[in-house]
């Protein structure tokens, strides 16, 4: 028993698959930019909201009470400086960097010899990672579906003319 498989227009199909990389360049760049903004938004949200359970301090200039975050929690917002210094920078078309320009950012993120970490950027990345991966998957799926529709249309077109 023999089974023959004949792929018509293989060169055209392979050409379309070869375009997949080119077709995905702009959507991937959109995901990179949007992913950076998503990470920044998560970091800001973690600092500005959520119950903090650290020590309450009396602060001066201006006079106020401030509840600090406990070790392991995102830092508690006090003056808004930390949040205002979180930036998204486009390094090149495929790389976005989320960074905090506050002088004390690294001390909060990683801790010091006298203070345990109050991370805010890495947890924001971890929380955003699934959404970013899903956005990449959706764009790949859309591009592949577009090629699949083209291949089906090509097959239908070939059947139409082979019947004549």
Segments from the language model and where they lie:
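Short, Lys/Arg-rich flexible segments
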Residues: 1-164
